[in-house]
Amino acid sequence: MPFSGLFSKSRSSSTRLEGWSLRNILPDSYFKCRNPSASSPSLSLNTLLAGMYASAASCFICTRGCTSGAAPPCNRAKPSLSASSLTTEAGRGFICRKTGCICNGANESAIDSLFVLQNALDCARLTGQTPYTVEVFRPIRNIFNRVREYTRASTTSVGLAWMSKYIYQYHRLMLMNLSPREPATEGWPLFLYPPPHLLVGYQYLVRTCNDYVFDTRSYSRLKYTEIHLPLQQKLNWTVMANCSYTINTGAYHRFIDFENFEETLAQVQQAVLAERVVADLALIRPMRGYGTTNMAGDRQVPVEGLLQDHYKNLSQCQNHAWGLADRMRIQNAGNKDIVILTTIRKLKTAFFNFLVSPRNPHTILSLPCDCLWLDAFMQKFTDPTLSQFQTIQSLPSQSVTKSIISALSLPGPAPCTPLSGGAFELRPRENGRAVTEEMRRRRGEMIERFIDRLPMRRRRRRAPPPPPMSEELSEPEVEAFPPASPPRRSFEEEVRDTIVEAIRLLQEELTVSARNEQFFNFAINFYEVIQRLEMLGNINELTIRRWVMYFFVAEHVATTLNYLHHNLRLYPPCSRWVDLELAQVVMRARDHEGQVVYSRVWNEMGENAFSQLMARVSGDLAATVERAGLGELEEEEMEQFMADIAYHENSGDVSEILRQVAINDTEVDSMELSFRFKVTGPVVFSQNRQIQSINRRVVALASQLRMQHRPLPAQHEQVQLPP
């Protein structure tokens, strides 16, 4: 089982590989003096990689007790192996470098393959330490049958909690450079060596929270739990992180402060939709926010993250607030994902422009029906010059809303029908079949050629689609009851179906981390609300104000949850060893004096908690928009509203929800967004005898001072340890 020796999680029940060291897999010539008192260079990663490939035959380690110097040797006879026979012998099994023991993997179920270097790098990445520090530390996860090598305080949850809080202060120590001879290791309690434990993932968690634009960050006290299973004894650490920041949801001056709001309501609604549409589909600049930025030698500077403070104040950032989540999303994309996401965004933009552009000589695109029209369609309707002829604000808002919902829901089915557009046409051939029929027959071939022309390498080359059926084929025999023909589809529906299929195939090419559509689909909920409100004739100042405010909040929630999901669940080393147990979003609305007007809480459990939270928050906020200005809920309305927002138990007080629904949003000046999440990771123990000895003496002195009611030495103080 790969990765089973060093970091096996509690749910793994077949772990037998206990010891670990790069000395198990690299020749001795790759190692120099590693005495902390000596001044020697660190073992470079290139050297480790070179040794790894040079010693490929010993990448599999025998687990019969000969994986470390402390374990007893194998009882099997040691065959004489020469360099020339190494490959032959290795082909029949796995070679233990400690004893030369050859174990046949086919007959020995106790053999676990371990790509040691991968686990070493995972440990280094998640603890923030260097590979050299990890090599000196020599981590081990499962201490079954080796407990006697450690002090009792090091191997129990109660003892480790005491050591962590009073002796080593792990909550701070794990954030430092723990390499031998570094300043953090001088004096009490480390004495020039790393600590006896490493909390794998803790430093990475703190770094992830620190790299974001939170105003406050707090962490609960570290808790430790013991895991006792057959042939396993392990420890885990758990911490609750609480990170928050405040956004100013005050007056949106572009329209809220109009003196004659009621008289200009239609223009206000059109302005909101036009601004939001431009942001959602990058109508003017489809490439805005894409790619990486390098500044003064710093590579891949997260510009959108650095600028996000600007987006915390709605009255200042104005229309620049729109599209925040999508702009942040692209910062995590690789080169291939950037090409794909850009193309998908352009296809959605082109489809929307096709629906809303007026039919005139400047906007019309006329092509023969037998051409590969998709590329020309995308280029034409994403051309920035097209914005000069846009008349979105003069169109009926219901039409604009339908168009934006249809475009944003791609590649899903069209929620709004019928669709109509007039700026694109395909000219039929003389005496040929219908245009829509020709489009349908040539769809597969056109999409494949469209994707093949993109500047990227596809995952797998697909077989070319069969050519269109020849018109000269003999007519089939007429059946007595011919099958019913499919309903006739409009030209606009055929255009949308083509774009749907193209986007679907493009999404298959995305990496897993770039497929997180669940964080960026919240806009559809809000546009559907606007559509329903207009049908009911309930568009007014209160609904528009709440729609803008909650859309702004949803942008921030989506951006933050996507960041946390990407770093804590999609980053491979973290997802392998660190578990997400609980996630929570708390929204507190405050007035001008800072008093809480209402608060909302959303909870989710499990590995997918972040994405599930986004779905609940967006649906909840969108549903609440419809209740703006309607006052308190009646008894018969309450049950239906709770169903609309998918209310869960332990998700806040119901009275707070009712207060949120009935409040006048002019009282809300700011929103405090708190993101809480509970994570659990593995504790690894050191196999270094010197570290174990120092820890034993440190614990003995600390216990003695505690019994005498004397204070422990200060950090880095030079003290004499007992023998």
Curated annotation (Swiss-Prot):
The record marks Y290, G291, G422, A423 as: Cleavage. GO terms for biological process: DNA replication; viral DNA strand displacement replication. It is found in: Host nucleus matrix. It holds the Pfam family Adeno_terminal. Residues 457-492 are annotated as: Disordered. It comes from the Viruses. The modification O-(5'-phospho-DNA)-serine is found at S651. One of its GO terms (molecular function) is single-stranded DNA binding. Heterodimer with the polymerase; this heterodimer binds to bp 9 to 18 of the genome. Interacts with host POU2F1; POU2F1 binds to the auxiliary sequences in the inverted terminal repeats and tethers the pTP-POL heterodimer to the origin DNA thereby participating in the assembly of the pre-initiation complex (POL-TP-DBP-NFIA-POU2F1). Belongs to the adenoviridae terminal protein family. Protein covalently bound to the viral DNA that acts as a primer for viral genomic replication by DNA strand displacement. Assembles on the viral origin of replication in an initiation complex with viral polymerase, DBP, host NFIA and host POU2F1/OCT1. The terminal protein stimulates the template activity over 20 fold compared to protein-free templates. Neo-synthesized viral genomes are linked to two preterminal proteins, one for each 5' end. This is Preterminal protein. It comes from Canine adenovirus serotype 1 (strain RI261). The lineage of its organism: Viruses, Varidnaviria, Bamfordvirae, Preplasmiviricota, Tectiliviricetes.
